[in-house]
């Protein structure tokens, strides 16, 4: 996992969002997901990301890989982009995050042109903390 960022001087606006609900990974885990403790391997991956280090996590299906980027996403300023080829997984995760109070969206081929444009507009306004993007969107001319 790689955290990409811009210096505040590179943009006209600064990210001024703060997180008043939780200040630690443990608080975020409890409030967002209802768990009292992390599964094996999750905390070390999260700590690496929060410290600004690269992290590579290989975990079996159902081991909680998503938590490894979702927790840092809500604790750190800015937007987290998640590249995922699985449309149904994107939809499920965005629904769960939105229900937990985390502003999330997805951009993939299931969106109408109107919904796509609205999602892009809101993303540019800084509405979302997490955006799931299908890989083919990254190669669409003009997307980035």
Predicted regions and their residues:
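Helicase-associated low-complexity/disordered flanking segments
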Residues: 1-55
């Amino acid at each position: 996992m790689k955290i990409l960022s811009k210096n505040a001087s590179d943009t006209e606006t600064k990210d001024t969002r703060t997180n008043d609900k939780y200040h630690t990974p443990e608080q975020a885990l409890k409030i967002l997901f209802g768990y009292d403790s992390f599964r094996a391997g999750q905390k070390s991956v999260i700590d690496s990301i929060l410290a600004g280090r690269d992290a590579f996590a290989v975990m079996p299906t159902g081991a909680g890989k998503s938590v490894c980027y979702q927790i840092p996403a809500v604790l750190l300023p800015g937007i987290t982009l998640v590249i995922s080829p699985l449309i149904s997984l994107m939809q499920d995760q965005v629904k769960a995050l939105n229900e937990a109070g985390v502003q999330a969206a997805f951009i993939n081929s299931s969106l109408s042109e109107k919904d796509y444009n609205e999602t892009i507009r809101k993303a540019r306004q800084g509405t979302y903390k997490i955006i799931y993007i299908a890989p083919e969107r990254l190669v669409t001319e003009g997307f980035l």
